[in-house]
Amino acid sequence: MARAIQFTKMHGTGNDYIYVNTLRFPIARPEKAAIEWSAYHTGIGSDGLVLIGHSDKADFSMRIFNADGSEAMMCGNASRCIGKYLYEYGLTSKNVITLDTLSGIKILELHLEGRTVETVTVDMGVPLETDTIDFDGEFPFLSTQVSMGNPHLVTFVDDIRIVNLSEMGPKLEKHPLFPDRTNVEFAQITGENTIRMRVWERGSGITQACGTGACATAVAAHLTGRTGRTVNVVMDGGTLTIEWDEATGHISMTGPAVKVFDGTIELRE
């Protein structure tokens, strides 16, 4: 049986997802839909699928499925886009929205130009754990492990241009030290409180940007004495401003949310 599903493709600093309002269009097998629809040659093309739904604990809920069908705990770029979607499609008139995710309740603050959401600030909460990883000499670098509700491994290098991310990303993502796999970031300090970062996302591979990865990189940079608490993280798809509040310990992330197009696709269940 096939049904027509309305979707919106959006991106946050180039991290592109397919968004579906499951209050209108429920999807029974989102893992399958994510794999089929994310394919660039035979589907819509994206880094994954984001489902907007009901929550008893917040204004709305968010579920994220990577391009390989695995479910993600959290995505900062997707949460910003959801804020834009909810406001501009009339699901809410609030400019502060609570969002129920697998890594907890997130608070979105919308920054408007008239009736258009230009940027969104997300309270990403407190980094859950940090650790230094030396790989027992297997690799010629030290890395910092940071959890932002999902796992990240941040490595600082002198020149990010020489990093073969296609080779190192999957090696580190699937390293035995990380049985649940990890997201992988390589970063370079390029100026006072400015970081250049590239990312290999767990379940998606190389992407243009990663919001939680930018947050994890900012945390790692400050913990290792490289930057202050407010930084700009420059990624292939754009720049995010990350602030780590000293009083509360919370990380906030501010950046753009962009609608690409609306469409309808057939769902076979």
From Swiss-Prot:
It is an enzyme of class 5 (isomerase). Its EC number is 5.1.1.7. One of its GO terms (biological process) is lysine biosynthetic process via diaminopimelate. Pfam families: DAP_epimerase. The active site is at C75, C210. Homodimer. This is Diaminopimelate epimerase. It comes from Bacteroides fragilis (strain YCH46).
